[in-house]
Structures are given as structure tokens and as C-alpha cells.
Design a protein with these regions (language model features):
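Intracellular loop-helix junctions on the cytosolic face of multi-pass helical membrane proteins
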Residues: 1-19, 147, 175-306, 310, ...
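Short amphipathic helix-loop junctions that connect adjacent transmembrane helices
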Residues: 42-65, 305-329
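Central cavity-lining transmembrane alpha-helices of secondary-active solute carriers
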Residues: 65-86, 333-346
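Conserved MFS/SLC helix-loop-helix module at the cytosolic interface between two early adjacent transmembrane helices
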Residues: 79-113
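Cytoplasmic membrane-interface "Motif A"-like loop-to-helix N-cap segments
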Residues: 88-100, 352-369
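C-terminal ends and interior cores of transmembrane alpha-helices
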Residues: 101-119, 366-385
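Hydrophobic core of transmembrane alpha-helices in multi-pass small-molecule transporters
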Residues: 106, 117-133, 386-405
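Glycine-rich segments within core transmembrane alpha-helices of 12-TM secondary carriers
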Residues: 151-171, 178, 186, 191-197, ...
């Protein structure tokens, strides 16, 4: 998906920390979107597997973690659809606006519609909306600055702070709502947050640069028809699978994993065999194969903070702090704190090192080894009846360090390795690796229990560290295949 729209020159009058005034608007809408997204996701798993007397649906715990993993994967797949809509059909601004409406509608469904129907409708709307908003928000931020504006990087840093502020506050407030009024009050607070962001955005959206209100490379009539038929075909196929009972909540993660795998293979084959791809570009696409696998392995562990770690937080952690019994979903507020604190530090570090910084393959390798070691920290608390919250803080701190090493370079690498005629496909390929890791976080969860935590965390560390070491051993030939890309 193209993020090349830059828009008009910024106005001289700056009213938001020396930046264009509309940055405050985009900061706020993204903050509220992340507030609602992480706030809802933080309590959703408990809503799924808690028994009815606790306000939940009473699903099997393994089924619940599988649904969460599949849902998270679909969100990343929807970023591909959102990018296409923004680039080719609606334009980035309208795509973001309609996506925000969809997110709000999803949270309202979760708060008002009881039972499984509310979950299905709500999660589907939130997944589609989040994908559209996630893939177009940065385009709108970029449109506020010219390409050579020295404030550009600082503007994205401020925007990034907004994202993590929302991710920090969301679980805190929805957890409070859950504690005092049940799950549906928590979902309702997520809906209110998204509504607040949507209202303030709608009032000033026309002040954005003209470029984001237009379609950069519109579909031709035939392309538009084929796109519509493809979407209808996907909906029909999924409807048939659901109607015949072949796709159920219990095996949803397997279907999603299969779709992602087939899609990734198709994208690789398409780019490797295309006639408009040069030999250098083909070599770069081939070099992305081991990095695609490494990226999927990394996110398979990292995203377990919404599956395995959420269950661990509920069953193993002592959330009684200073005499107050806190909600287990607060585990999801820990990572954003570290990102805000250390994100700018890592950015400055890479800038200072310049050409002396490690090549991308070594960064991937280091991130895998570090997150594998983070999972081994769980072993120190094996057999402890009530684990101190400080241990999960330490584990997530180490996970965040790994994320800050690998996450920023992932998208950048995909854009640098992409064939000129297939940039959208390469970005789609990158997001399939994140989606694969996310669905794996749900697929792996049934192997975890209080009784199996030692072998589980041991093997998670072994597999991930081994993958990192293997990537380190082959990093020179992989870098050579990148043909000059670092």
C-alpha cells in the first residue's frame, strides 16, 4: 500500500507544539482509536472464557485464545484492504473516516448485543475498521509536511506518542468499567472513547490538505468491477464454510492460518515470476523469505501478551497492590509505557550510529534471541503460587526492547526490498508475516497451562533463540541477496 502522498506545504501558523494544527486532530483520533482497540482487546479474552456467573460467555479457554489470535491476525490482513481502499478507491481521508465509524459501531455492538452474536458482529466491524484506519492514518500525518520539512520526523514521533497514550489508558479505564459494571460497561467505555475521537475528527477533517481527499491511483472501471467481485467471492466462500459447519470458532485459527499461508505463497510466487521484476529485485524478494519466517516467529511470541500472558495474568499473578485488587487486563498497559520511554531513545541511537549500525538481518536475529530469553524468565517463577507483578513487568520490558529493535525496521525493509512495480504486494507480504505470527499466538496457547508452563516456556525460548542464531549464521548470504539494501 502506498504511503507516498505528501500533500501541500504546511501552513505558516503552527499551534500544536510548533507543528501544523491538524496534527493535534490526528494525534487525538489515533489516541482514542488505540484506547478503544486495546481497551476492548484487553478484556475480550476474559469475556470469552469467564463463566456466566462472572459475566462471561463460558467458552473453552483454548477456543477463546484461538479466537483472539485469529481476530488479531484478521486486523493485520485488513490493513491490506485498507491500503487498497485508500490508494485506489476512496482516498486515504475517507477511508480513515469510514473506518473510524466502523470501529465505533463494533464497540457499540459489543456493549449492547449480548452473547456470541455481539462478539461476531463487534469483532468483525472493529477488525475491518482498525485495518483501514491503521493503514491510512500515517498517510494523513505525512500530508501535513513537505518531504524536506525538518519537523516531519518529530511530527511522527508526536503521533506515535498519541498511539501509545491510548494503548496505555485503554486497558486501565475499560478494566475499571469491567470491575465496577461488568464486561459490557467496559466495552461501552471503548465505544465512548472512539466516539469522542470520531466527533472531534469529523468537525475539522476538511482542514486536511486537499491531496488526502483524492484517490492517488484510481481503479479503472474493469479493475473496480474485478475488485468488487473478488470481495463478494471471499464473503460467499466464508459464508459457505460457516453455513456448512466447516469453519467454527474452535477451528477458526486453523482456517485463518491457512488463508495467510496461501496468500503469502501466492504473493511470493507472483513477484518471483513476474516479467516486470529485474534479477536484482527477484534476488531481494528471495532474501525476504527467511526474514518473513523470522518476523512471523517473533510476533508469535510477542502477541502472546493477548493470549498466553493474559491467561497467566489472570491465573498466576498477584494483582493485589497496596491493598487494591486490580484487573488482570492491566498487563496490556505495561508495554506502551516502555515504548513511550525508550522509543525515542532507540530512534536516536540508530541515527547516531548511522552507517555503523547493525544490518537489518542482525537486528532481526538479535530481536529473536532477546524475546526468547524473555520467555525463559517465566521459568524463574515456576511453581510459585502467587507471582509478583514485577516479574511480568520485567518480562514485558525485555519484550519491548526486542520489539523496538525489529518492528521499526520491518516495514522499512519491506519498502526497500520491494520491486518497483510491486510495492503494494510487498507491503501486503510483510503484513501477512505479522498476521501469521499473531494467529500463531492463539494457535500455540492451548499448549500452555499451569501444569505445562515449564516445558511450554522452555520450548518457546529454544525455538525462538534457535531461529535467531540460525539467522545470524546465514545473515551474510542473505544480505548479499539483498543487492545493496542494508
Amino acid at each position: 500500500m502506498s504511503h507516498t502522498i505528501t500533500g501541500a506545504e504546511p501552513k505558516e501558523t503552527n499551534t500544536f507544539f510548533g507543528h501544523p494544527r491538524m496534527l493535534a486532530n490526528l494525534f487525538t483520533v489515533e489516541m482514542w482509536e488505540r484506547f478503544s482497540f486495546y481497551g476492548m482487546q484487553g478484556i475480550m479474552i476474559y469475556y470469552l472464557y469467564y463463566t456466566a456467573d462472572k459475566g462471561g460467555l463460558g467458552l473453552d479457554k483454548d477456543m477463546a485464545t484461538g479466537v483472539i489470535g485469529a481476530y488479531g491476525a484478521v486486523v493485520y490482513l485488513m490493513t491490506i484492504l485498507g491500503g487498497i481502499l485508500g490508494d485506489r478507491l476512496l482516498g486515504p481521508e475517507r477511508t480513515l473516516f469510514y473506518s473510524a465509524i466502523g470501529i465505533m459501531a463494533g464497540h457499540i455492538s459489543l456493549s449492547l448485543i449480548p452473547g456470541v452474536p455481539g462478539v461476531v458482529i463487534g469483532l468483525l466491524l472493529v477488525a475491518i475498521g482498525s485495518g483501514g484506519l491503521k493503514s491510512n492514518a500515517s498517510v494523513l500525518v505525512g500530508s501535513l509536511y513537505s518531504d524536506n520539512d525538518p519537523r516531519r520526523d518529530a511530527g511522527f514521533t508526536i503521533f506515535y506518542i498519541g498511539i501509545n497514550t491510548g494503548a496505555l489508558l485503554g486497558p486501565i479505564l475499560t478494566g475499571w468499567g469491567w470491575s465496577f459494571g461488568g464486561f459490557h460497561l467496559g466495552f461501552g467505555l471503548a465505544a465512548v472513547g472512539m466516539a469522542a475521537g470520531l466527533i472531534q475528527y469529523a468537525l475539522t477533517r476538511n482542514n486536511l490538505p486537499a491531496s488526502v481527499h483524492h484517490v492517488g491511483t484510481p481503479f479503472t472501471g474493469a479493475q473496480k468491477r474485478n475488485f468488487a467481485l473478488a470481495l463478494i467471492g471471499v464473503v460467499v466462500i466464508i459464508g459457505i464454510l460457516l453455513g456448512t459447519g466447516l469453519m467454527t470458532a474452535d477451528n477458526l485459527k486453523n482456517w485463518v492460518m491457512g488463508f495467510i499461508f496461501i496468500g503469502a505463497i501466492a504473493l511470493f510466487v507472483q513477484m518471483l515470476t513476474a516479467k516486470d521484476v529485474t534479477s536484482d529485485e527477484r534476488s531481494r524478494v528471495t532474501a525476504f523469505i527467511p526474514l518473513w519466517i523470522a518476523n512471523a516467529v517473533f510476533w508469535a511470541l510477542y502477541q502472546q501478551q493477548f493470549t498466553v500472558m493474559a491467561v497467566y495474568s489472570d491465573e498466576r499473578l498477584n494483582w493485589n497492590i497496596l491493598g487494591m485488587e486490580l484487573s488482570p487486563n492491566l498487563i496490556n498497559s505495561i508495554n506502551p509505557i516502555f515504548i513511550v520511554i525508550f522509543g525515542a531513545m532507540f530512534s536516536a541511537l540508530w541515527t547516531k550510529w548511522g552507517d555503523r549500525q547493525p544490518v537489518t538481518t542482525l537486528k532481526f536475529s538479535a530481536a529473536l534471541i532477546i524475546i526468547g530469553l524473555a520467555f525463559w524468565i517465566f521459568l524463574t517463577q515456576a511453581g510459585v503460587q502467587s507471582v509478583n507483578v514485577g516479574w511480568i513487568v520485567l518480562i514485558l520490558f525485555v519484550c519491548t526492547i526486542a520489539e523496538l529493535i525489529i518492528s521499526p525496521v520491518g516495514i522499512s525493509l519491506a519498502t526497500k526490498l520491494a520491486p518497483k512495480a510491486h510495492r503494494v504486494n510487498m507491503m501486503a507480504l510483510y503484513f501477512t508475516s505479522v498476521a501469521m505470527g499473531t494467529v500463531l499466538s492463539g494457535w500455540l496457547a492451548p499448549f500452555y497451562s499451569m501444569e505445562t508452563e515449564v516445558p511450554y516456556f522452555t520450548w518457546m525460548g529454544i525455538i525462538t533463540i534457535a531461529t535467531g542464531v540460525l539467522l545470524f549464521l546465514v545473515h551474510k548470504p542473505v544480505q548479499k541477496m539483498m543487492r545493496g539494501v542494508k
